[in-house]
UniProtKB/Swiss-Prot annotation:
Protein name as annotated: Replication factor C large subunit
Protein species of origin: Methanosarcina mazei (strain ATCC BAA-159 / DSM 3647 / Goe1 / Go1 / JCM 11833 / OCM 88) (Methanosarcina frisia)
Function: Part of the RFC clamp loader complex which loads the PCNA sliding clamp onto DNA.
Region (Disordered): 467-610
InterPro entries, A to Z: AAA+_ATPase (IPR003593), ATPase_AAA_core (IPR003959), P-loop_NTPase (IPR027417), Rep_factor-C_lsu (IPR023935), RFC_lid (IPR047854)
Biased composition (Basic and acidic residues): 467-478, 502-515, 594-603
Record text on subunit structure and interactions: Heteromultimer composed of small subunits (RfcS) and large subunits (RfcL).
Length: 610
């Protein structure tokens, strides 16, 4: 047997991978069928352009595909589970490779490993793309799968199926001895045989166990090998055979517990194959009736598991379905039976696209009618199907729901696109385009017009602040208001739309206040006129003095005005009362009459204290 070596740092399973089909251990019949299919490509395109290699893991399926490429001198393009295998990726890589010849005119082998694991969002549409590529490929394609039923019936029907079985222990022993010799490890016959038996038909696992046992050793004996064995999952078809052929409930349950199947899945397998196994030529259905009686009771427990979320009831359901199927027969049923995959799963796979479309339509109807998708699917789909029969309302209904042409076909119950449906769909698209243009136009006119200047116009109120003498050269912040040649102004921003930064306060040492500022209640001057630096307050109220303005104020009583005599008497009374109390009110009043000095009120803030 020819083996090739690579770097010693890698695993032995990779280091001693077979280079040709003659190096493959076991499965001689499968290898011969694979070679025969490859030779048909030498004379043209065969009837089956793709082949499916299926069987348990670790028995040489992928190695056989690469060994075939080595024998035929084909280039290899491989996609495995670590790659994203959506429809777009498969069509881009495998599709382009399958439709073009190589530069030198040879063949190119396309290998899709773990093809039965095309599930989920990451591989959406991958199986459909594979089916389309196989039908039109100009290059050989090999699909590798552990479970043949993980592939769709469409793919299986257009491919050649080649089954790889578990490798027998006696076939592994010579190959394992060859590996020991190449690595310089002395292995006894008993040790190698023990490793082969513990592998459970998985040759790759046997090589890995040999490498682990021989690590750091020059000799390997049977005592160095663990006898625990591997936890090998039971094959579903072998388990079905043990369940239906057995008359021992315990043995049947052990086969069921070794399966990688839940009781919800196992009940469908038994339901599908029980009438096939217990079918009698004389037409007696008593065994089938008894078996389905136990199966119905098991289904009741499975329903309680879902309803109560009590998974301990799985034990009772498994016992009823397995033991009931095994013990319901009244006589043995010899002969080979080809067990079938549950037909319910096949029907669900075939109708998956239609169920997805139904749910999508129900979701659109629920959004439009403010109902849940479940309610719309069960109660409103038929009603909307009736509405679509009227062509006038069908156009608006299609536009409002946003239905696609395939969804329109589903609601109308049509298997193909008719002229009527195409017309409804086209008019609905035109209606949507018109509504879209109208909405954009309304949004355009609702939008505010852009400002002429980047800075919005704001209300400015100039306030004159006297400069400190001898500090005329000090820098002042610029103001958008008008500037006086004698004094610079600071403006107070009173804009309401976009608040502006307020001017910095002047320190008290930089401000020169008037000697006699007017109290706040008498400040009637306009803020837009400059303040005097010295001297009396100018006349800001239409050329009238404050005493004259006081006389024009309305009296407290609207019925009677104070006469000049009463006014003079009131002033004299104020003077007399102030003099009796020793208050300087008389001096203050006198100062107000002659327009001279005015007393500054205590604790009274002026305009400059902002």
């Amino acid at each position: 047997m020819v083996w090739f070596k690579m770097m010693s740092a890698i695993e032995w399973a990779e280091k001693y991978r077979p280079r040709t089909l003659g190096d493959v251990v076991g499965n001689r019949k499968a290898v011969q069928d694979l070679r025969k299919w490859a030779e048909e490509w030498q004379s043209g395109i065969p009837e089956k352009r793709a082949v499916i290699l299926y069987g348990p893991a670790g028995i040489g399926k992928t190695s056989s595909a690469h060994a075939l490429a080595g024998d035929m001198e084909w280039e290899v393009i491989e996609l495995n589970a670590s790659d994203q295998r959506t429809a777009g990726v498969i069509e881009k890589i495998a599709g382009s490779a399958a439709s073009m010849n190589t530069f030198f005119g040879g063949k190119r082998l396309i290998i899709l490993d773990e093809a039965d694991n095309l599930h989920g969002t990451a591989d959406r549409g991958g199986m459909r793309a594979i089916s389309g590529i196989i039908k039109s490929t100009l290059q050989p394609i090999i699909l590798i799968a552990n479970d043949i039923y993980g592939l769709t019936p469409t793919v299986r029907n257009i491919c050649l199926e080649i089954k790889f079985g578990s490798v027998q222990s006696r076939s592994m022993v010579p190959a394992l001895k060859k590996v020991c010799e190449s690595e310089g490890v002395s292995c006894s016959q008993e040790a190698v045989l023990q490793i082969a038996e513990n592998a459970g038909g998985d040759f790759r696992s046997a090589i890995n166990d040999l490498q682990a046992a021989a690590n750091g050793k020059k000799a390997l004996e049977a005592e160095d090998i663990s006898t625990a064995g591997r936890d090998v999952k039971e094959n579903i078809f072998k388990a079905m055979q043990k369940i239906f052929k057995s008359t021992d409930c315990k043995r049947a349950l052990e086969s069921a517990y070794g399966l990688d199947e839940s009781p919800e899945d196992l009940v469908h397998w038994i339901d599908e194959n029980l009438p096939i196994q217990y079918a009698r030529k004389d037409g007696d259905l008593e065994d089938i009736k008894t078996g389905f009686g136990y199966l119905s009771k098991a289904d009741i427990y499975l329903g309680r598991v879902k309803k109560r979320q009590n998974y301990r009831m799985w034990r009772y359901a498994s016992m009823l379905m397995v033991c009931g199927a095994a013990l319901s027969k009244t006589r043995p049923y010899p002969g080979f039976i080809k067990y079938q995959q549950p037909s319910l799963w096949r029907r669900l796979g075939q109708t998956r696209s239609r169920r997805d479309m139904r749910d999508n339509i129900a979701s659109k109807i629920g959004e439009h009618s403010f109902e849940s998708m479940h309610y719309s699917r069960n109660n409103l789909l038929g009603f909307y199907s009736i509405l679509l029969k009227d062509e006038a309302s069908a156009v608006e209904l299609t536009a409002n729901l946003g239905l696609e042409l395939e969804e329109l076909m589903y609601l109308s119950g049509s298997a193909k696109v008719s002229k009527k449906l195409q017309k409804i769909y086209d008019e609905a698209q035109n209606l949507l385009e018109t509504k879209r243009d109208r909405t954009e136009e309304q949004e355009f006119f609702k939008a505010p017009a852009p400002a002429a200047d980047d800075k919005q116009a704001t209300l400015h109120c100039p306030v004159n602040i006297p400069e400190k003498e001898g500090n005329a050269s000090a820098e002042k912040p610029e103001s958008p208001g008008p500037q006086s040649p004698e004094r610079k102004q600071k403006t107070l921003d009173l804009g309401f739309d976009t608040p502006q930064k307020l001017p910095e306060k002047k320190r008290s040492s930089e401000m020169k206040l008037p000697e006699n500022p007017e109290p706040a209640e008498n400040n009637l001057f306009s803020l837009s006129e400059p303040l005097p630096e010295k001297g009396p307050i100018p006349d800001f109220a239409g050329k009238k003095s404050l005493p004259e303005l006081e006389e024009e104020k309305p009296s407290l009583s609207p019925l009677k005005k104070m006469s000049p005599a009463n006014k003079e008497a009131s002033k004299q009374g104020v003077k007399q009362g102030a003099s009796e109390k020793g208050s300087p009110a008389a001096d203050t009043q006198g100062g107000m009459e002659d327009g001279s000095k005015k007393a500054e009120p205590k604790n009274q803030k002026t305009l400059f204290d902002f």
